Regions:
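Intrinsic, low-complexity polybasic segments
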Residues: 9-10, 14
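Bacterial N-terminal signal peptides
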Residues: 31-41
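Boundary at the C-terminal end of the N-terminal hydrophobic targeting segment
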Residues: 43-47
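Aromatic- and carboxylate-lined catalytic core of secreted/periplasmic carbohydrate-active enzymes
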Residues: 48, 368-494, 501-522
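Active-site mouth of glycoside hydrolases
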Residues: 52, 60-64, 68-330
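Short, hydrophobic beta-strand segments that form beta-sheet elements in well-ordered domains
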Residues: 311-317, 332-336, 353-354, 458-459
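Catalytic-core region of carbohydrate-active enzymes that cleave or remodel glycosidic bonds
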Residues: 325-395
């Protein structure tokens, strides 16, 4: 029996089908008409969402996004990327939790990479590490036993419909909630442990993929694996084309498997610690860059004949670095464990600059909240906190036992909602980084976005009170000091200013406070 899909606009044939299914009599005709109208209305509303132009850089300010007619920044604290490939993770519950917290972004791995349960990166309850035999890959299982992670080997020539049903449903459920999804197609493998679980490893498939050094997996020197990678990437891109809430990322942390030391954070450390993580700034080598360029072409060529074109993100490096050169067609520049300087050094690129992953600063919420305010008030476009409180069985984000090298909690998500609300209370598209207005802020570091002469978004990082000297034009002003933990107004004042220097006294605060300053009249 053919059931009309709600993922496309219903046809006349669908309408006739529904009437026949209702088997209406003359008496039931009115009831049938009402039910049919409800069906068509619901389906049409869904088709309208799917026909919206995909999220893009805002034409008036490319450091923010245009999404469904509004200028937006993307802020979240999301799960560890395994929502689709782990069938034991209830992503409906997860997305509902994100939506309830007022967050609008999540990152999703496309299924080509999985981790080792209770081992990889010390994550004990890892939704990117399905249990034995539970890895739901894009590829179908064969009839041959022997996959290293349990169950049968994979047949790389066949897709698994269950994966793509789950993938499309995830994108659709996120779309209903206004949540943008970064689909990460590939990832570095870091060491042999993850490579042992790869479906592309010849021991795990029936397709005789070439036996290679795993560090060559994401290079053009990977033998017949390259063709399977292209087919996989194109399939994920094609399946997602109708959705307006998708950004594609080429590869997660491409420098990790093929690093080139480019800079260090603290040059005063002694080798070898000076030159390794967490002090090194590494870039991918030339072999990696050539492969990434090819992968970007797969995305672009696959979408060329399709209705929609989506943004493409390049994961550039950890921490901060002035970008020397981006791959062709890149819209979003992703940094991990980012410093605010990742924005300031690259603002002139006129691309979205993203803090794409947090972690390795302990479990305390304060560290990640402060990172979010510092980054976004420097002109950042995206803040994506990796939240280890989302685990299988706790998809509402309430697993608060230690679980890996990062943080995450309902409290942190509430605090990030304060940041999102603060930014949305301003004319976001008119804001730009401002190094002039705050002349001095005693004992703290100041980050400022402003529409000069109109409104100012100021974040003070540290402990107060602080005396803040501002250079403001003449006018009538309202000033609200916002508690970055609760969103409450800790202090408000209105004042008339004749122009020039103006000193404001903050209230007491710990680990940061925000100031919303608006000029109401000359």
């Amino acid at each position: 029996m053919r059931i009309p899909s709600l993922w496309r606009r219903p046809s006349a044939a669908d309408a006739i089908f529904m009437i026949r299914m209702l088997r209406v009599s003359t008496i039931n005709a009115l009831r049938a008409a009402v039910l049919l109208a409800l069906f068509l209305g619901t389906a049409h509303a869904q088709s309208q969402v799917n026909r919206l132009a995909p999220i893009r850089l805002h034409p008036a300010n490319p450091h923010y996004f245009l999404f469904r007619g509004k200028a937006v920044a993307l802020i979240t604290s999301g799960e560890h990327y395994g929502s689709v490939l782990n069938p034991d993770f209830d992503y409906h519950r997860y997305l509902a939790a994100l939506g309830a917290d007022g967050l609008n972004y999540t990152r999703l791995f496309g299924g080509s990479y999985v981790e080792v349960p209770s081992k990889s990166f010390g994550i004990l309850r890892n939704d990117l590490a399905p249990g034995p035999g539970r890895y739901l890959a894009p590829w179908a299982r064969s009839d041959s036993p022997g996959y290293a992670g349990g169950g049968n080997k994979f047949d790389l020539d066949r897709w698994d419909p269950a994966f793509f049903t789950r993938y499309r449903d995830f994108l659709g459920e996120a779309a209903k909630r206004g949540i943008v999804v970064e689909v990460t197609l590939f990832s570095s493998h870091y060491d042999e442990n993850q490579w042992r679980l790869s479906a592309l490893n010849p021991v795990n498939n029936i397709n005789n993929t070439n036996s290679i050094d795993w560090k060559k997996l994401h290079t053009l020197e990977n033998g017949n694996i390259l063709a399977y990678q292209e087919r996989y990437a194109r399939q994920l891109v094609r399946e997602a084309n109708e959705f307006d809430n998708v950004i594609f990322e080429i590869e997660n942390e491409p420098w990790s498997d093929r690093p080139v030391l480019t800079d260090v954070i603290n040059p005063y450390l002694r080798p070898p610690g000076r030159d390794i993580y967490p002090n090194s700034v590494d870039l991918p080598d030339e072999l990696s860059m050539a492969w990434q360029a090819r992968a970007a072409e797969w995305i672009q060529k696959e979408e060329a004949p399709l209705p929609n074109r989506h943004l493409i993100a390049q994961n550039y490096c950890n921490f901060r670095l002035s970008v020397r050169k981006l791959l062709p067609g890149i819209d979003v520049v992703n940094f991990h464990y980012a410093y605010p300087e990742a924005v300031t050094l690259n603002y002139s690129l006129d691309r979205a600059i993203s803090y794409d992953e947090t972690g390795f600063l302990g479990h305390d919420d304060d560290a990640y909240r402060r990172q979010a305010w510092n980054f976004m008030l420097s002109g950042g476009s995206v803040f994506d906190s990796l939240d280890y409180s989302f685990t299988p069985g706790h998809e509402d984000g309430t697993d608060l036992e230690p679980n890996g090298p990062g943080g995450g909690s309902p409290a942190l998500r509430g605090q990030l909602r304060v940041l999102q609300s603060f930014l949305q209370s301003m004319s976001l598209v008119d804001l730009q980084p401002d190094s002039h207005t705050v002349r001095h802020a005693s004992g703290v570091a100041a980050r400022v976005l402003s529409n000069p002469g109109q409104e100012y978004a100021i974040y003070l990082d540290g402990n107060g009170p602080s005396e803040v000297m501002l250079d403001l034009p003449e006018g009538q002003y309202s000033a609200v000091w916002v508690n970055t933990k609760t969103g409450s107004a800790d202090k408000s004042e209105n004042f008339r200013h004749s122009g020039g220097n103006k000193v404001l006294q903050s209230p007491e605060f710990q680990n940061g406070i925000a100031l919303r300053l608006k000029r109401s009249a000359p």
